């Protein structure tokens, strides 16, 4: 790994890199500092816009990146909902067409991977009617699956469901959406767990990066949300069943990657 560039430290953006450049020019230098030497007061460091806790966080991440064979770890306790049924949830959206064209779920029972199955609700058209039908079907599925624990990665799913509720208010109410995403039953693994409670020896904390670190491989050679949008565009013009299946497979793999990450974090908790 290149340990000369600080760009590889997760969440260390350009403004913060520039604030530190005169004193700290590389990951290795950041890993070797004593953060206390740069702290001016309880809430300030010598670097504008960087608080002591933030500097200590970047220092810890740099140490992981600069250390051969470093392992991820928990820096805070984690708790997850107790549920027999777990749903791992991912959506696909075409922002140019302004359509949510796929709601995908991998369901697992009793923490047994042998029980896993993929459930998908696909909008085969870019029309409001088709989008609404897929959303309504996904919503009925979610209601029928209760009680369960829901896992997703980043705020995107919740944001899009709020938007869909506004577009199609008779499918569900605002209160029902907020209840669905209540953190006691629905967990944003990225914002509420990975960022708040874990550290990883990786350049970023994307689901692709962390799941690959844990050994997961996507079936598609070029997996990405942007690629899925391109495939949906091709589906719209070709109606090629193979293209549709490629979209579904990619979404299923994203859901399974989320499940693998949850299991990986649970393993870290058992080790700590």
Map each language-model feature to its residues.
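Generic beta-strand/beta-sheet core signal
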Residues: 33, 89, 108, 151-154, ...
